């Protein structure tokens, strides 16, 4: 499980704009006066650190990923970096954390992996999981094949992604994470991307990536798939649903 740095850079402005303000404010309030040990899982190039570092003064960050190339870029934040196989060793990564963070990660995880991570989270620690895909998408104008294509994309999302045994939870990940952390104080808020013509490169990249995933399912014939892809590439607006979850100690 790894991502192209160019894709991460392309989505970064949309991610930054989408983060839900209430979980961030609650996290900042809880963290005030604490010198936190923060572990960011699946850190990529360090986007979560860049989003939160100013809100968590004095925190000691460890950025964790399995991809050495992404970690080399994440090191530019000045935080400690750690290369780790998250599929196998996530429990080790969070064992001494006061705060665990992740962005756009949990929809790639299996139910087993989420349960393991939740069980390993120290009782005193908090977890902030942002930008988890929730399956809701609105493209304008919409192509007639949109419902069938989106259903096929969701099926692809629920295939194995390498983060735990079995299929990824895809749009169901936040619900599973909330259930696994039900003994904590939870706040869940929507954090959708709201894309316009100004976001054309991201819209086009999404259209291409989703079309590739749908093609692997065989749900659409090639002609319909191409027409749907092109309609998405030319969309005037797109809203892509995500959820941000904050879990604070009970």
Region locations from a protein language model:
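Conserved class I S-adenosyl-L-methionine
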Residues: 35-44
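A conserved beta-strand element that flanks and buttresses the S-adenosyl-L-methionine
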Residues: 101
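Class I SAM-dependent methyltransferase Rossmann-like catalytic core
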Residues: 1-31
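Conserved catalytic/acceptor-binding region of the Class I
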Residues: 124-190
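Short amphipathic alpha-helix with an adjacent loop that forms part of the alpha/beta core around
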Residues: 89-96
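A short, conserved alpha-helix within the catalytic core of class I
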Residues: 108-121
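Class I SAM-dependent methyltransferase SAM/SAH-binding core
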Residues: 46-89
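C-terminal helical/coil "lid" or tail adjacent to the Rossmann-like core of SAM-dependent
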Residues: 189-235
